[in-house]
Every structure is written in structure tokens, then in C-alpha cells.
Curated annotation (Swiss-Prot):
Binding site for NAD(+): S12, G13, N14, I15, S163, A164, G165, P166, G167, T168, R169, A170, N171, N290
Molecular-function annotations in GO: acetaldehyde dehydrogenase (acetylating) activity; NAD binding
Protein name: Acetaldehyde dehydrogenase 4
InterPro entries per UniProt: Acetaldehyde_dehydrogenase, Acetylaldehyde_DH_C, NAD(P)-bd_dom_sf, Semialdehyde_DH_NAD-bd
Gene3D superfamilies assigned to the protein according to its UniProt record, in alphabetical order: Dihydrodipicolinate Reductase, domain 2, NAD(P)-binding Rossmann-like Domain
Family: Belongs to the acetaldehyde dehydrogenase family.
Catalytic activity as recorded in UniProt: acetaldehyde + NAD(+) + CoA = acetyl-CoA + NADH + H(+)
Pfam families per record: AcetDehyd-dimer, Semialdhyde_dh
Active site: C132
SMART domains, A to Z: Semialdhyde_dh
Listed GO biological process terms: catabolic process
Organism field: Azotobacter vinelandii (strain DJ / ATCC BAA-1303)
UniProt keyword annotations, A-Z: Aromatic hydrocarbons catabolism, NAD, Oxidoreductase
Amino acid sequence: MTKKLKVAIVGSGNIGTDLMIKILRHGQHLEMGALVGIDPNSDGLARAARLGVATTAEGVEGLARLPGFGEIDFVFDATSAGAHVRNEAFLRALKPGLRLIDLTPAAIGPYCVPVVNLEQNLHETNVNMVTCGGQATIPMVAAVSRVARVHYAEIVASIASRSAGPGTRANIDEFTETTSKAIEAIGGARKGKAIIVLNPAEPPLIMRDTVYVLSAPADRARVEASLAEMAQAVQGYVPGYRLKQRVQFDEIPDAAPLNIPGLGRLSGLKTSVFLEVEGAAHYLPAYAGNLDIMTSAALATAERMAQSMLNA
């Protein structure tokens, strides 16, 4: 039997519970050790208990008191940006080599988008999964960056209001800041901007993302091929990720440049990418692709890290 590394998930809300179910069903190098929350009445903790997973409603302090804490190699943090800072400090003092996968916008460690830079971060002890909008759109920015220098990238993430729990709503400002920084840091844009829209439509619509990229002039066929290749790579761990329609291109001539705040007047090739992300519906409804892409990316990251650790 293949050895598996034990994980704890901190946060028993939508994301934490969905991630638990993914690990229970599909974990190859990982297995559940504990689900941690702060609300003893949460559905996530009740579900974990029914599935035979150890639980605590006393936060990371309760996790540290569980009999199996010594066997935990990975901790996924699905709380909030502020809570992650405290959780990281507490857990790191107890287990310096613990691997933390941060699903909040705290970004203590380097940003990680699996198809873009996972291999460079395999030995990090804390990686940040950016945001749902970042996981969906940064691969597209990086795909253009492989072909041409990207001056500016702007993303708009539209998610169903019903899929946005209290953690998501509390982190709106951090969402835009973290996503914008990651568009630059790993997407390759000189300047990035992120916008999130909570769509109140009923019945809820699946996650939709729009990516606008202004780059140096480039061969359109090469850009389109790079985008299609990247989308296929993301589908390797998020099957519901897809290009909604063909990529659109617009030439921005020198005579009529765009005025980008912070960069000035720029010309080049404008690339518009339209995406949708349908969730796998493990715990959350299919419209909650925004949450599914976060849990799927986090699981893909930890699985690859665990594989590397087990093969060392």
C-alpha cells in the first residue's frame, strides 16, 4: 500500500469541507488527519465526524491537543487572512517543518498557481494559493507572457453571491490586493488589477472570469495557441475550467494609445479572454466553481509536494 501523508484542514466552512471530501475521495499521497473549526455546530465538523475524521472546534490550539497531531505533515488553512497569520505563527512554533497551504489572501509565503510555478515552490513550507480569481485568470496572463511582454493585465471575477461565505465576504479588499500583486509576480504583467463581482442572480450562475491583457505586438496565432495549451493544463486538476468563447484581439495603435494609470500611454496588442469555471459538486453546488478551483489547486499543490517528499 502506498504511504500517505496526513493532513489537517483548519476552517470547517465551504472551502474546508469541500477540500476534506476531495482528499477522502481522491487523495493519492494524502489522507485526512483532522478537520478544525471554531463553531461546534458547523455542518463541516458534523460531516467530518460522520466520515470518521478527527475533529475539534477549538481552533489550532485544539488541533495541537489532538492525539494525532504529531503525525500531521500538511495543514491547509481555509480561514481568513488575519487568522492565517496567527495560525501560522502558532503551528510553526510547534512544528517548524510543517507544510502550510494557505487558501486565504494572507500571502505569508510565495504565491502558487500550479500550472505556472508549482515546481519552483516544491520545497517551500508555506505557499499561498492567491484567490479563486487568481487561480482562474493568472494562467491566462502567464500564457500571454510566454509569447509577448505584458504591460498590463486586468481581471474581472464574477461569482455567485450564494457561493460567497463569510470568509470570502470578509476578505474582499485582500482579494483584490493579493490577486493584483500575483498577476504581476507570477502572471508576468508590469501592472495588474483585479475586480470581484458577487452576482446575485437566481438561480445562481457559475463562475465567469474575463481577462484583459495589453502586451507588446505579437503573433495572434501563437498567443491563442499558448492560451489553449494553458487552459488544457488547468483542466488537468479543474475539469470544469474552460474558455467560454474564442479569444478576441484588438490592435491598439500608436496613434490612439490606452492611458494606463501608473504606466502612461501604451499601444500594442489587446487580448480578451473569457472563461467559465464549473465546480465538481463534491460538497458545493456546481455553480460554485470559484470555491472548487481553490480547493482543486490546493490539493494539486499538496499532492505534488507530498509526492516529492515521499520520493526524497
